[in-house]
Amino acid sequence: MKKTLYVSDLDGTLLSPAPEITEHTAEVINALTAKGEYFTFATARSIYSAIPITGRLDINVPCILMNGVSIYDIRNKRYLKTEFIPVEASAEVLKAFERNNVRCFMYKLEDETLVCYYSELNTKVMRSFAESRKNDYKKPFVQVDWLADHANGDAIYYTTTGPHDVLYPVKCAVEKIEGVDYAFYLDVYNGEWYLEVFSAKASKFNGIKFLREEFGFDEVVAFGDNLNDLSMFEAADVKIAVGNAKDELKAAADIVIGCNDGDGVAEWLSSAVMNNR
């Protein structure tokens, strides 16, 4: 019998529009893992927002965080793998933001603790992001005068959110920097765009490749909705897009299922996996 890993994106895919894990989704996934199947998630979220929002799920395989930057073992509360941004590349990334007068958050992994640095919160969206993370998830935020003074080799992620036309020039500059990759996509909740910059070695593709090799999976079934899930699809044997997915992802999918507002992932798992075991 094949050893299969089921891995789902969170926002827009496994999570409802609320966003939350519905009772039905929790019941299906927990029944799945109780029967010996393997389930995890791959997300752009960090540990601080991903772990609480999936708390009702029995995740039995380490998860992929921050678009593949880190592999985190939820059960044993430890990072298995993290891709750091080279110092020279970090300096160039910060210059790209500065030249375009765009502020960003810088994430660093310090003694197994994820810390978020920023210089100023100069937009309503950035202030809202910081306040929600501080209040809802108790994420450590540190304000400094210059991010460049603290980009000393343990930076793993740069992120910001705003209008497409404001972030696009930064994206164009970042894509020319050696040693980093990026994700640039529309947020499913507020209509703003996200720009996320990370090591060129980090991706959902490489995250799934690591899990496949580390745990000996014969097959990977992946669920997604957005452009940052394309690399995950490349690593999967079966590619499944939810009904609300971007057209580009649907075009790359083997199967299109129900939308996230109708527990599409759980419904498919229930009918295609649980009923056939």
Regions found by a protein language model. Name each.
Residues 9, 43, 225:
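Active-site glycine-centered loops adjacent to acidic/histidine catalytic or metal-binding residues
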Residues 57-59, 67, 177-178, 235-236, ...:
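Short, structured coil segments at secondary-structure junctions
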Residues 3-19, 93, 233:
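Asp-based phosphoryl-transfer active-site loop
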Residues 20-129:
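Active-site phosphate-binding/coordination module
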Residues 60-66, 182-183, 239-243, 257-258:
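Short hydrophobic/aromatic-enriched beta-strand-loop microsegments
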Residues 26-34, 98, 175, 209-213, ...:
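Surface-exposed amphipathic alpha-helices with a cationic face
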Residues 1-5, 22, 194-277:
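Mg2+-dependent phosphoryl-transfer enzymes with acidic/Ser/Thr/Gly-rich catalytic loops
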Residues 107-221, 227:
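Conserved acidic, metal-coordinating active-site core of Asp-based
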